[in-house]
């Protein structure tokens, strides 16, 4: 039986860590040192894809024998990227702008094994339609959840689900930050099968 390569999640996101833990695979977490500044003219999807690959590549360069997962998510409101708000005031602005509208969350993932010359990337879109939210609902949600580290200020895995009218996606965990269906397929191709004994 071949030895399973070391698995590394190139992310400091607790949401991605918690999602990857669902696969019951041993893995380490390494913080990727990547500049996440958007480039001029870069689309939200392009930004998510570039950052996912950059995160995986930064860690794979340090750990070439490991299989590395990099991921990034960018919310897209009519072609404008919406990132993590970082503050209450910015979160209020984001949710007011998004209420009653459809927002696409682009969740990109790259799996890379430098020693094995393996690299695959995919971007999973999740379309979310927000309710026509009242200002008092926005305030209550933000004071309760404090989602200032989430793209678009929406934590659908908790109370944020009450903000929504609908979610459309082929990979339900993509909205939380890591598309596990696609990630499993890429891991199998890289030699790590979550279902292998």
Name every feature range the model reports, one short phrase each.
Residues 12, 32, 114:
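Cofactor-binding loop segments of dinucleotide-utilizing enzymes, especially the Rossmann-like FAD-
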Residues 2-8, 42-197:
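Anionic-ligand binding patches
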Residues 24-41, 118-125:
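Short glycine-rich, Thr/Ser-proximal phosphate-binding strand/loop in the N-terminal lobe
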Residues 2-25:
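N-terminal beta1-alpha1 ligand-phosphate binding loop
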Residues 18-22, 39-40, 61-62:
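Short loop/helix-cap segments at secondary-structure boundaries that form the rim of catalytic
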